[in-house]
Design a protein with these regions (language model features):
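Phosphate-binding loop of NTP-binding sites
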Residues: 19-25, 57, 72-218, 271-272
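Short pre-catalytic strand/loop immediately N-terminal to key active-site residues, enriched for Gly-Thr
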Residues: 251-256, 304-308
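A conserved, hydrophobic alpha-helical segment in the catalytic core
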Residues: 162-177, 210-212, 252-290, 420
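ATP-dependent carboxylate-amine ligase
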Residues: 1-36, 42-49, 60, 64, ...
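Short glycine-rich anion-binding loops that position phosphate/pyrophosphate groups of nucleotides
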Residues: 69-71, 111, 155-158, 174-176, ...
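Beta-strand->loop->alpha-helix junctions that form or flank phosphate-binding loops
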Residues: 50-53, 89-92, 129-131, 206, ...
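Short glycine/serine/threonine-rich phosphate/pyrophosphate-binding segments
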Residues: 12-16, 112-118, 136-138, 262, ...
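Redox-cofactor binding/interface segments in oxidoreductases and associated redox assembly factors
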Residues: 64-67, 151-152, 170, 204, ...
Length: 437
């Protein structure tokens, strides 16, 4: 089938496109700009890519799948509708793509990409569709010629309800994307309950208050008592976490922090329930190498480490700051310098007090302009809100010859040459800190 994707450069839609290309479909797609992802699709998956969107791109295709960011006034959407081509949102398309598969779905407010990638490492003969790039297989997709699919299930638009889970793992539940749920908390929590109900096997973090309240048959992880002997170590300068899980013995995994042990433990319990052997699980977990943009070490010098992290919610950032302080101590760095690009005006406003708290313990904080993600601009006094910090307000950052430059009004206002530097955000900060912007 000829399938066209509007917004193919997004991490979620590109995963579906690659998966369907591997399944034998002829794919094409469009986006507003050329990126690493669109280049990969063109070079390695035979996709015809149109930049920017153009109505002619849908000529001759049989199905159009579009991202949540696409509006009805998009020229390709309009042309497809006029031509009577089948139009499916990403959410709606999941039913046709995953309907016949044995899906191992991972949901949750935080940690779902990490847990999904770990589960994919533990079950190496599975397909994988993840909302991030696994460093083990260098992609957000892995193809296996069978029915098993590790799938990162997205709650932001209730699309996880279309994921056909055989196994459902939920890391935690916290109100997010509430604009989609019309700020109706009951609807939000019911979506998670329904997601778990769909599955044959359910694994939960039983210390999450909402998950603990559910009356259904589940495999429960109690992190505070089931995970013991946690130890953080460096292996060739990279962070690893060692821990003991219940009576299953010792495990080691790439990454740093109690949350890493928690995510790994959920993946281990899920794999065990699927019938994987414990010694295979222990060995395969060591193949996990982290995921791009999560505690992602993009520069590793003896006197200066630069980390890129996708964290864009205060809970995520607070947990990662704790891990960064541990890593700082292990590496013997004097200072932790953090750059933050807030993501969405709505999220920044809804969580402002928590954002102010979550950077506690950093030595310097740089705040960049809010990445709008298509939202209308709102005036927020971030300089005033974060005045207690050693603060720099800047327009952008870049990295040249191992030096991170902080830029305001086209002038370099400060430079970071040593110690630990970390950039947080889900916008284009990842390209800035990598020196690719």
């Amino acid at each position: 089938m000829k399938i066209h994707f509007i917004g193919i450069g997004g991490i979620g839609l590109s995963a579906l496109a690659k998966f369907l290309a591997n399944d034998g479909h002829q794919i094409s797609g469009s986006d507003i700009k050329q990126t690493e992802i669109t280049n990969d699709l063109a070079l390695n998956f035979g996709a015809k890519i149109t930049i920017p969107h153009h109505a002619d791109a849908v000529e001759g295709v049989e199905r159009v799948i579009y991202s949540a960011a696409v509006r009805p006034n998009n020229p390709e959407y309009q042309r497809a509708k006029a031509l009577g081509i089948e139009l499916l949102s990403r959410k709606a398309s999941l039913k046709t793509i995953l309907g016949e598969k044995e899906v191992y779905a991972v949901g949750g407010a935080h940690g779902k990409s990490t847990t999904s990638a770990m589960l994919a490492s533990i079950i190496p003969n599975s397909n994988a569709l993840i909302g991030a790039i696994s460093k083990e297989f260098g992609s957000n997709v892995r193809y296996a010629n069978n029915n098993k699919v590790v799938f990162e299930a997205d709650e932001s638009d209730e699309s996880f309800l279309n994921s056909n889970p055989y196994l459902a793992i939920v890391t935690n539940v916290e109100p997010e994307h509430m604009e989609y749920y019309e700020y109706d908390e009951e609807r939000f929590y019911n979506a998670y309950k329904n997601f778990l109900t769909l599955a044959q096997i359910r694994v939960i973090n039983a210390e999450d208050p909402f998950l603990a309240s559910l009356d259904m048959e589940v495999i429960k992880l109690f992190p505070s008592k089931d995970i013991t002997n946690t130890e953080f170590v460096l292996v060739n300068g990279t962070p690893h976490t060692k821990f003991t899980l219940k009576d299953l013995g010792n495990f080691e995994v790439f990454g740093l922090g109690d949350h890493i042990a928690l995510d790994a433990s959920l993946a281990i319990l899920g794999a065990l329930a699927l019938g994987e052997k414990i010694e295979n699980i222990r060995a395969n977990l060591l193949h996990y190498k982290g995921i791009k943009k999560r505690f992602d070490i993009v520069q590793n010098k003896e006197n200066c480490v630069v980390i890129d992290d996708y964290g864009h919610h205060p809970t995520e950032i607070k947990v990662t700051i704790k891990s960064l302080k541990t890593y700082q101590k292990l590496r013997g760095f004097k200072k932790l310098q953090v750059i933050w690009q807030p993501h969405k005006y709505s999220r920044t406003i809804d969580n402002l007090p928590a954002f102010v708290e979550c950077f506690e313990g950093v030595d310097e904080l740089v705040i960049l302009p809010i990445w709008s993600a298509g939202e209308l601009e709102v005036d927020i006094d971030l300089k005033g809100a974060f005045s207690r910090y050693n603060l720099h307000m800047a327009d952008k950052v870049t990295r040249k010859d191992g030096v991170v430059q902080i830029i305001q009004d086209n002038n370099i206002i400060t430079e970071y040459r040593e110690d630990l530097i970390t950039a947080f955000g889900a916008g284009d900060i990842t390209y800035q800190i990598r020196g690719e912007a």
